[in-house]
Amino acid sequence: MAHPHLLAERISRLSSSLEKGLYERSHAIRLCLLAALSGESVFLLGPPGIAKSLIARRLKFAFQNARAFEYLMTRFSTPEEVFGPLSIQALKDEGRYERLTSGYLPEAEIVFLDEIWKAGPAILNTLLTAINERQFRNGAHVEKIPMRLLVAASNELPEADSSLEALYDRMLIRLWLDKVQDKANFRSMLTSQQDENDNPVPASLQVTDEEYERWQKEIGEITLPDHVFELIFMLRQQLDKLPDAPYVSDRRWKKAIRLLQASAFFSGRSAVAPVDLILLKDCLWYDAQSLNLIQQQIDVLMTGHAWQQQGMLTRLGAIVQRHLQLQQQQSDKTALTVIRLGGIFSRRQQYQLPVNVTASTLTLLLQKPLKLHDMEVVHISFERNALEQWLSKGGEIRGKLNGIGFAQKLNLEVDSAQHLVVRDVSLQGSTLALPGSSAEGLPGEIKQQLEELESDWRKQHVLFSEQQKCLFIPGDWLGRIEASLQDVGAQIRQAQQC
């Protein structure tokens, strides 16, 4: 086997050559190339005139000396038009029922069948055998067929519960194509003078027969790690729970895994990675409704579980909760505790400051910062006399936020533990403590747990960075995964600063 990175670079250059002159068809070309390199079938859904046949025609140039066959199905199409006419000579001289297959599907490496659902039962039955077993029964003989890629196309989906479903299930990759959307691309397409039938691929990039056969064996040697299997099983279980999810046969799952192996192999990796699972969005849908549903479920899998994003957030939540518990315990120990006075006949409970608090101006620290009067507040300065009067008689209390400016009106109360608590407009509270009595920084236990979590996050981010160099995965999906990881990292860093 060539060096993995050299192979990945070669396949990337091969795909770029095939994409020349085709606008907004890069993803389709790349997946069709992946299908061709792994011996799978593709279904293209879309209106007429959007280069479906040209995509299939281009794929012929990925291989040296590949033969292509294309045919437009109608309700009147006959097996002779697809699989070759009967040999009159063989029937006349030897009484043999044999087809002349030269130039027809049984001898083609690349096959394109347009309006596939209009094919009759005789064609469909033979086609199923060709796809499944890569064999063609020609009279009394069973011949191996060299087909590497079958591209079937239509502007409609097969009817449910029809005889076409068996063939549809064999189409592993399903792509929904539309007209060129971007203005600049549309103009370039209109003014392009490129001959669509020219070979755009240098001979040095084309795949030889020997390479193709060798790669088929090496693709099967790509491993499926346990954590990737768990993600696949999680997706399968989730789809089984959804009432509107499409039925996915065991055969389709197995063929999809080989496609993931091929994606890893041609990306220079020895094992399937979570990023390869994005390809399942083009393998598991059945119709428009299930297309959206599958994409949503895979998006959840990629941005929530594939790189342990949700697991890390769960751990972070537990750490933050533990930190709050420690803060509460510390608050109970260090908070300023006022003295409850007697007064059975008083209309309100009265309090006084501890005797050791004698300063004329008291600076009290918030156990946790609050936003008060549009300011992030960490401490409040009170006039001792004003605070004593409020403790004794109630009414309005004011203090200088962070010790600056004019004294501002505060929502202050004494809780059941006789601690002073200040609240913001959303009624979130923070206990007040004297300077020197409040613990500074994160507790060692919390700091260590956050450092371990950040280390695990960095490992996952490095893994993603190494795996995202995959030709067959659209960039917008990679962007969403990166954003999900960055969000987790930001939340960890925010917790470290508390």
Swiss-Prot record:
GO terms for cellular component: cytoplasm. Belongs to the RavA family. Its EC number is 3.6.1.-. It is found in: Cytoplasm. This is Regulatory ATPase RavA. ADP binds at residues 23, 49-54, 196. It catalyses: ATP + H2O = ADP + phosphate + H(+). Component of the RavA-ViaA chaperone complex, which may act on the membrane to optimize the function of some of the respiratory chains. RavA functions as an ATPase. SUPFAM superfamilies: P-loop containing nucleoside triphosphate hydrolases. The keyword DNA-binding does not apply. Keywords: ATP-binding, Chaperone, Cytoplasm, Hydrolase, Nucleotide-binding. It comes from the Bacteria. Homohexamer. Interacts with ViaA. It comes from Escherichia coli O7:K1 (strain IAI39 / ExPEC). PANTHER family: ATPASE RAVA. GO terms for molecular function: ATP binding; ATP hydrolysis activity. ATPase activity is stimulated by ViaA.
